[in-house]
UniProtKB/Swiss-Prot annotation:
Protein name in UniProt: Parathyroid hormone 2 receptor
Region Disordered: start-end pairs: 496-546
Keyword Glycoprotein in record: yes
Membrane topology, from the record: Multi-pass membrane protein
Gene behind the chain: Pth2r
Glycosylation sites recorded in the entry for this protein: 51, 106, 116, 121
Subunit structure: Binds to TIPF39/TIP39.
Leader sequence residues: 1-24
UniProt KW Transmembrane keyword: yes
Keywords from the UniProt entry: Cell membrane, G-protein coupled receptor, Glycoprotein, Membrane, Receptor, Signal, Transducer, Transmembrane, Transmembrane helix
Record's compositionally biased regions (Basic and acidic residues): 508-519, 537-546
GO-annotated molecular function: G protein-coupled peptide receptor activity; parathyroid hormone receptor activity; peptide hormone binding
Family: Belongs to the G-protein coupled receptor 2 family.
Length: 546
């Protein structure tokens, strides 16, 4: 088909586009931590100091250039107001606004005598309260979304692990790989919960505004460093979060490699490659995460290690490589499925049915291979607008609920798992029935439960409500009469309910007026053949002479 021939070019274009967006993805987030904000301000401060040195040598003016903690102010003219755009490196500022500062006629900047600081008007840089409230509600909704999603995924994956681990018939290499994938999803969810608890996720605009208005940001940046030991737990939480995030991506890659090898590799020995898959899933992510932690502790040991500091590519680049490789495996697998469908269509199959089959298979593969990751990577990266909000909701929805979808595909909708659960359920019901005390007149011979009631013999093979009735040729009006010959049969098990089910002696009634006497002979001595009827109401069967 034409589009199959163009598939390699499409794949190459997507990979190229992904590579072009890698730089924007590595050091950008939907939000920014307070540590990241501080680093950006410190970089601007160092650049400002270089500019101030050059201005002292070249320029002239009354008010000296200086760094006030947020903006690098140039030389000011006496008696005039200087304006500078709101700094773009402050995340929660209105980047279209302008900050003002006044140079007095005596050649000094306006001074706040109470706080011993220069004055600047940043009111235009602050976001409007309604916009701030809207952003806060937006992030709260995102938090609720991914918290619910990861919680549901965690619970469903835990049940799936118990089911596969309980049944020995399900213990095989394929399911072992599934179990490792389930565990990686659970660890990813738990690490996110822990990280949210011990690390500050976002920089609130109110916190930044209070620092600026009180003049504390400059002191906070240039002040002495605090005790780093108090951030040990926070650093461990961040490192474990990054490691479990990376292992989850690589176990998704392992699933793709395993499926791809089953399709394309002849005589593929899954047992032989199991330890190799384990090394890829758990070992390789540990290498680059440890390398990142060492680089971070050596070069930029600040706070909780949530900021990029230019070293995020150490772990982000291998993760993006795993996503890209998995996407290539997905395209190749879909190509093979489509080829098989057209081959079977040539034999005379229904084309619509084949397309539906391809669509179902592709949908399952999208969940298994994590194709949504490459889709979100290829989207333009921005932090505002309706499209960004839609993208954030979709991305967090698929990321958090992917574990739930994977558990459905690999466990709950698996035919082998369903068969084992049904067999266990049937055995459990049979064991419950066997432990129950037999009814009145019931006795067990080996594994068969037999009940003798009003001319009725019940066997377990006949069903719960069916009675096989032996009836004498003559009508009987006596009560339930029990034959005790069963005691001598082999395999007899005495029932505790026999004492309550002993037959009561019933006097024989003789009807002299009609000249007939009730027949007290045993059933086996009847002079006429017996008839078998099905009694569905216990001892209410009627006799019909043949």
């Amino acid at each position: 088909m034409p589009w199959l021939e163009a598939l390699p070019y499409i794949c190459g274009w997507l990979i190229l586009r992904s590579c072009l967006l890698v730089g924007a993805q590595l050091d950008s987030d939907g939000t920014i931590t307070i540590e990241e904000q501080i680093v950006l301000v410190m970089k601007a401060k160092m650049q400002c100091e270089l500019n101030i040195t050059a201005q002292f040598q070249e320029g002239e003016g009354n008010c000296f250039p200086e760094w006030d903690g947020l903006i690098c102010w140039p030389r000011g003219t006496a008696g005039k107001t200087s304006a500078m755009p709101c700094p773009s490196y402050v995340y929660d500022f209105n980047h279209k606004g302008v900050a003002f500062r006044h140079c007095t006629p005596n050649g000094t900047w306006d001074f706040i005598h109470g706080s011993n600081k220069t004055w600047a008007n940043y009111s235009d840089c602050f976001l409007q309260p309604d916009i701030n409230i809207g952003k806060q509600e937006f992030f709260e909704n995102l938090y609720i979304l991914y918290t619910v999603g990861y919680s549901i995924s965690f619970g469903s994956l835990a049940v799936a692990i118990l089911i596969i681990g309980y049944f020995r018939r399900l213990h095989c290499t394929r399911n072992y790989i599934h179990l490792h994938l389930f565990v990686s999803f659970m660890l990813r969810a738990x690490s996110i919960f822990v990280k949210d608890r011990v690390a500050q996720a976002h920089l609130g605009v109110e916190a930044l505004q209070s620092l600026v208005m009180q003049g504390d940001l400059q002191n906070f940046i240039g002040g002495p460093s605090v005790d780093k030991s108090q951030y040990v737990g926070c650093k461990i939480a961040v490192v474990m979060f990054i490691y479990f995030l990376a292992t989850n991506y690589y176990w998704i890659l392992v699933e793709g490699l395993y499926l791809h090898n089953l399709i394309f590799v002849s005589f593929f020995s899954d047992t032989k490659y199991l330890w190799g898959f384990i090394l890829i899933g758990w070992g390789f992510p540990a290498v680059f995460v440890v390398a990142w932690a060492v680089a971070r502790a050596t070069l930029a040991d600040t706070r909780c290690w949530e900021l990029s500091a230019g070293d995020r590519w150490i772990y982000x680049x291998p993760i993006l490589a795993a996503i890209g490789l998995n996407f290539i495996l997905f395209l190749n697998t879909v190509r093979v499925l489509a080829t098989k469908i057209w081959e079977t269509n040539a034999v005379g199959h229904d084309m619509r049915k084949q397309y539906r089959k391809l669509a179902k298979s592709t949908l399952v593969l999208v969940l298994v291979f994590g194709v949504h990751y490459i889709v979100f990577i290829c989207q333009p990266h921005s932090f505002s607008g309706l499209w960004w909000e839609i993208r954030m909701h979709c991305e967090l929805f698929f990321n958090s609920f992917q574990g739930f979808f994977v558990s459905i595909v690999y466990c709950y909708c698996n035919g082998e798992v369903q068969a084992e659960v049904k067999k266990t359920w049937t055995r459990w019901n049979l064991s419950i029935d066997w432990k129950k005390a037999p009814p009145c007149g019931g006795h067990r011979y080996g594994s068969v439960l037999t009940t003798v009631t009003h001319s009725t013999s019940s066997q377990s093979q006949m069903g719960p409500s069916t009675r096989l009735v032996l009836i004498s040729s003559k009508p009987a009006k006596t009560a339930c009469r029990q034959i005790d010959s069963h005691v001598t049969l082999p395999g007899y098990v005495w029932s505790s309910s026999e004492q309550d089910c002993q037959p009561q002696s019933t006097p024989e009634e003789t009807k002299k007026g009609h000249g007939r006497q009730e027949d007290d002979s045993p059933v086996g001595e009847s002079s006429r053949p017996v008839a078998f009827t099905i009694d569905t109401e216990g001892c209410k069967g009627e006799s019909h002479p043949i």
